[in-house]
Amino acid sequence: MPLQIIDYSEQLATIRRVGADAVLLSLVGEDAVAFNRAFGVQGLGRSALRLSCAIEENELLAIGAQNTERLYVASSYFAALATDANIAFKERYHNHFGDRAPTLNSLGQSTNEGVHFLASLFERGLFEPSQWKHERREPIAYRSAREAVYGGDGINLAPTYMAVAEGHVFRVIGRL
């Protein structure tokens, strides 16, 4: 469907008419928020689950707790991730930025992780991007709240997690 639709009634009517058991969402930002709000208002969460790979914590807040019934998300990071690395990351984040810090999400976490990965490359003397793609050494260790690892030889071992929305937060239900 096109982006920036204000009225999702036609799409929601189709979902209801065909008796969909599940809806795969490929919307981001305001489009994801608007669609999920309308989905929730129409009570479609009682009959169809939703799966997205692009909803993060700030969008979840904007969707509204009352509109998250049976909303599942697959992502490489959730603030609710209960790994030792993420607990330490969140502690450092809140110690630095305080109680009013912006909500942690995959965008902020991946930026932080990217900086640490780049620092690891520089520590190995790899200062030019042309050197990076030819790097065939052993795995590169770097700080990762989601426990990602660069395995060497162009292999990135980044995990993917599944979570379910519970009101304004995600509950991680497993690693895929």
What spans do the regions from the language model cover?
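Short beta->alpha linker loops
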Residues: 3, 27-30, 55, 109-113
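Extracytoplasmic/secreted proteins, especially bacterial periplasmic and envelope-associated proteins
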Residues: 7-10, 34, 55, 84, ...
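Residue-level signal for nonpolar/aromatic packing positions in well-ordered secondary structure
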Residues: 23, 35, 71, 93, ...
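Extracellular/periplasmic periplasmic-binding protein-like sensory domains
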Residues: 39-112
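Structural signal for conserved beta-strand scaffold positions within catalytic alpha/beta enzyme cores
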Residues: 52, 73, 164, 172-174
